[in-house]
From Swiss-Prot:
Pfam families: 40S_SA_C, Ribosomal_S2. Belongs to the universal ribosomal protein uS2 family. Keywords: Cytoplasm, Ribonucleoprotein, Ribosomal protein. GO terms for cellular component: cytosolic small ribosomal subunit. Residues 257-268, 280-300 have a biased composition (Low complexity). GO terms for molecular function: structural constituent of ribosome. The keyword Ribonucleoprotein applies. This is Small ribosomal subunit protein uS2. Component of the small ribosomal subunit. Mature ribosomes consist of a small (40S) and a large (60S) subunit. The 40S subunit contains about 33 different proteins and 1 molecule of RNA (18S). The 60S subunit contains about 49 different proteins and 3 molecules of RNA (28S, 5.8S and 5S). Interacts with ribosomal protein S21. Gene3D superfamilies: Glucose-6-phosphate isomerase like protein, domain 1 (3.40.50.10490). The keyword Ribosomal protein applies. It comes from the Eukaryota. Required for the assembly and/or stability of the 40S ribosomal subunit. Required for the processing of the 20S rRNA-precursor to mature 18S rRNA in a late step of the maturation of 40S ribosomal subunits.
Length: 306
């Protein structure tokens, strides 16, 4: 499938990641169309998937995605919670359109409803769970790429990528590998360069566990600002004790304003006394003038004389 090119061949690092994520472990049951991807069966009944065939189908799926001119015409769907985070991350890095959660029936066939879409390529997580979009895609001739386990039905599936779809780590790793291969085929990411996006970002995380981690991080968080701020403040206070003595010495001169009133008071008092005496002298003349009232009596004498 990879054309026999060494550049597209499976390397040891990717194989190690697949084995660590249990991508090679299938189900106990096997579909007759998936028998070609099974390497052998273990003693406990679990079928082992051939990872070489997995990588070949993954490269083929990446080539199909790159062939679409507009990345938004590629729809990625996952109704299972374990694959919704991986689908959203894949769409964010490749430009595809994600549908995480419940698929609206008739989105590909009913042109009347507002959710009507016309994708050119469809990528689903599990054909058994996402059977509705696969069935509608068959009505409008949309090619379908699916991550399939050994017991997954392959009806209306054009490209099947055999892998373990029961493990959240395996699901996240397969979407991460597919996104990396798409970026490499587009020329965005060189093949001799490591992708700076880690695989853990594609893994499913339990909301309760994430909340607990956030609470623990808040509890363990220490505020170093308080001890750092208090120490320099004490040092500043100790240093400012010396200027305080100079301020005490400077407080003596303010006594001069108190002497100012003493300087202005005597002349003010002398002037007031002088003015008071002058006024009294002037007012004393008024009673003297008032003593001239006997003139009225003189007039009265004139009246008696008359």
């Amino acid at each position: 499938m990879s054309g026999g090119l060494d550049v597209l061949a499976l390397n040891e690092e990717d194989v190690t990641k697949m084995l660590a994520a249990t991508t090679h472990l299938g189900a106990e049951n096997v579909n007759f169309q998936m028998e070609t991807y099974v390497y052998k069966r273990r003693a406990d009944g679990t079928h082992v998937i051939n990872l070489r065939r997995t990588w070949e189908k993954l490269v083929l799926a990446a080539r199909a995605v790159v062939a679409i001119e507009n990345p938004a015409d590629v729809f990625v769907i996952s109704s299972r919670p374990f694959g919704q985070r991986a689908v959203l991350k894949f769409a964010a890095h490749t430009g595809a359109t994600p549908i995480a959660g419940r698929f609206t029936p008739g989105a590909f066939t009913n042109q009347i409803q507002a959710a009507f879409r016309e994708p050119r390529l469809l990528i689903v997580l599990d054909p058994a769970q996402d059977h509705q979009p696969i069935t509608e895609a068959s009505y409008v001739n949309i090619p379908v790429i699916a991550l399939c386990n050994t017991d997954s039905p392959l009806r209306f599936v054009d490209i099947a990528i055999p892998c373990n779809t029961k493990s959240s780590h395996s699901i996240g790793l397969m979407w991460w590998l597919l996104a990396r291969e798409v970026l490499r085929l587009r020329g965005v990411l060189p093949r001799d360069q490591r992708w700076d996006v880690v695989v853990e970002l594609f893994f499913y995380r339990d909301p309760e566990e994430s909340e607990k981690d956030e609470q623990q991080a808040k509890e363990q968080a220490v505020v170093p600002a308080k001890p750092e701020v208090v120490a320099p403040v004490h040092e500043d206070w100790n240093e400012t004790l010396e200027p305080v003595a100079s301020w005490a010495e400077d407080t003596a001169p303010p006594a001069a304003p108190a002497a100012a009133p003493a300087f202005g008071a005597p002349p003010a008092q002398e002037e007031w006394s002088a003015q008071v005496q002058d006024e009294w002298s002037t007012t004393a003349a008024a009673p003297a003038a008032a003593t001239a009232a006997p003139s009225w009596g003189g007039s009265a004498q004139d009246w008696s004389a008359a």
